[in-house]
Structures are given as structure tokens and as C-alpha cells.
């Protein structure tokens, strides 16, 4: 999402630099890099998991990034790191902090609470409510968006797709169970995010990690994409990408799913944690007009719309 936003702003004539780790590649955008910290993996936030341990290497990398940012004297900073040091390092800068996750980490909640509301955004109305309930006055919602790319025409295969990172909160077991109940073979696409997570994918075709274009093409050929997440997901890019490929989505009705899936038009929502309800949603998805699915996504989930929102917010902060 960060790369897409940067490219979108560059195409509108803005000068943009991405501060990131060595090895990153974003053609068309200037990159200012730091070495990847050795403890980056242990700093990952795991929903429903144990709190992430201290990661001094990550804090040092963030400090190095912000040293470079300050020396470049930018008009405004779009900050997407979900780490308390990132908020601290940005003090005094014209910065917009996007909260891509719920208020899971006490240190991040405290850092966000001490940041002016006008400098805070989150990605859905669901997350806005969650952060405000945690005592953080978030000033705006800036929804994610996905690029509209050409996808193959033709009838989809009689297959269900489960896509995203391989981790407990994604509910892969429920998705596969519901697919079986609906009589659909399943494919699973995604990289392992939580090495400790041992999931049984027996009976499903394992596609592994795909490029974004490869995944979009698989979505275009799939009868339905199943999103059986077990937590209040902040947005749901997989669901958005599937709809943009014309693939309807069957999802649990929780988190931002009602904002991302247009129930009855681009997919169907199911009772959370109820695989029978999810199977029924899958079956109903097979009756939807895939052209209408894609049209719905273009209206609501476009990358251009997301860039519009960020451009307006960043210019407002830069001029304040």
C-alpha cells in the first residue's frame, strides 16, 4: 500500500522519497534505505498472540530513518510504521501517522494518544471506533485502495481461493471447512507469517507466495475468495483485490468486512466463526454477476480514491 501511494503521488507531480530497508525496489520513486535490523521478525505484531518482545535493532533503524528524514527537510511525512519509536522520532515534524492495526500494543496506544488528532488516520470506520474506544482521538479515515489492472476474461474455474499470510488470525481452517461444505475444491495462496503456526492444508492446492499480478490472475479465475478472519481485521486488502478482479468474496461479518464487501453485490457476509453460515455465503456468491462485482470495487476501493484522500490530508498537514 505504501508503494502504491508513493507511485500515485509521483504520477500527480509530487516529489516523493520512501525511507525503507536495503533491498527494497520501487521503480519510479526515490529510495533512502537503512540496513534491515536483525530483530525485525521478533517485532512483528501478532493479533491474539503474545506481545512482541523488545526489538532494539528496530528502534535504532527507525532512529536512523528519521535522522535522514530530518536532514532532507520534507514538507510532510506519511508515516506507516506501527512502532512506538516512530511516533517519538516524528515529534516536531509535519507528519501523518496511519494506524494500520488495532490498538493492540500499549506503547503504541500511548504514543498515538500523545499525537494531535489531525495527524492521525486509520483505514476504516471500524478501526476509528476501536482507537477512539481505546482513548485515542484519531482525526480521519483514509481507506486503502487497490489498483485496477487487466485480468483474464472468461468463466472462472469451480474453485475457491483462500489468500493472505499463513497465520492463525486468518482463519484458514474455517475457510477450508466452509469450502468443503459448499462443495468447492480450494487453493491456498500466501507466505508463512507465523512460523509457529501449524495448519493442516490437506486436500487444498498450495500455491505458495505469489506476486501481486499472479494473485490477481488467480482471483480472476476463482469462483469465490473466502475471508474467514478470526479477528477484527482493520481493512482487508485480499477482499478488495479479489473484488477488483471480479471475484466475489465470502467473509465473516466482522471488523471492516462490511465496509470492504458490498453485501449482496460484490459478495456475502456470514455469521462470524460459523462455517455453515460461511458455506451458505460461498454458495450465494456463485450466483453474483462478476461484472457487477468489479464495478462495485471500482466505485469504492480504487487506488485513485485512496491517493485522493492521502494527497488532500498531506497537503492540509503541510500547510498547517
Where are these regions (language model features)?
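Catalytic cores of nucleotide-sugar-dependent glycosyltransferases that transfer UDP/GDP/TDP-activated
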Residues: 1-320
Amino acid at each position: 500500500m505504501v508503494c502504491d501511494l508513493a507511485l500515485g503521488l509521483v504520477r500527480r507531480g509530487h516529489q516523493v522519497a520512501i525511507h525503507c530497508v536495503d533491498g527494497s525496489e520501487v521503480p519510479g520513486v526515490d529510495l533512502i534505505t537503512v540496513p534491515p535490523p536483525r530483530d525485525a521478525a521478533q517485532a512483528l505484531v501478532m493479533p491474539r498472540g503474545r506481545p512482541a518482545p523488545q526489538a532494539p535493532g528496530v528502534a535504532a533503524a527507525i532512529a536512523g530513518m528519521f535522522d535522514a528524514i530530518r536532514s532532507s527537510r520534507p514538507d510532510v511525512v506519511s508515516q506507516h510504521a506501527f512502532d512506538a519509536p516512530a511516533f517519538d522520532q516524528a515529534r516536531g515534524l509535519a507528519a501523518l501517522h496511519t494506524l494500520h492495526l488495532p490498538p493492540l500494543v500499549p506503547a503504541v496506544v500511548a504514543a498515538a494518544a500523545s499525537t494531535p488528532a489531525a495527524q492521525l488516520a486509520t483505514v476504516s470506520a471500524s478501526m476509528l471506533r476501536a482507537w477512539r474506544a481505546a482513548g485515542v482521538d484519531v482525526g480521519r479515515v483514509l481507506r486503502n485502495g487497490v489498483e485496477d489492472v487487466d485480468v483474464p476474461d472468461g468463466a472462472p474455474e469451480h474453485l475457491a481461493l483462500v489468500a493472505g499470510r499463513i497465520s492463525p488470525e486468518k482463519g484458514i481452517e474455517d475457510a477450508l471447512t466452509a469450502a468443503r461444505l459448499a462443495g468447492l475444491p480450494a487453493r491456498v495462496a500466501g507466505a508463512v507469517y507465523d512460523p509457529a503456526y501449524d495448519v493442516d492444508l490437506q486436500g487444498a492446492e498450495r500455491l505458495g507466495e505469489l506476486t501481486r499480478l499472479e494473485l490477481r490472475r488467480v482471483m480472476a479465475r476463482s469462483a469465490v475468495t473466502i475471508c474467514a478472519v478470526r479477528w477484527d481485521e482493520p481493512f482487508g486488502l485480499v477482499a478488495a483485490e479479489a473484488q477488483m478482479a471480479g471475484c466475489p468474496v465470502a467473509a465473516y461479518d466482522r471488523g471492516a468486512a462490511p465496509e470492504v464487501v458490498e453485501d449482496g453485490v460484490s459478495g456475502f457476509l456470514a455469521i462470524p466463526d460459523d462455517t455453515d453460515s460461511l458455506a451458505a455465503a460461498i454458495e450465494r456468491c456463485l450466483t453474483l454477476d462478476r461484472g457487477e462485482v468489479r464495478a462495485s470495487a471500482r466505485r469504492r476501493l480504487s487506488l485513485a480514491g485512496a491517493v485522493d484522500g492521502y494527497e488532500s490530508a498531506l497537503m492540509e498537514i503541510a500547510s498547517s
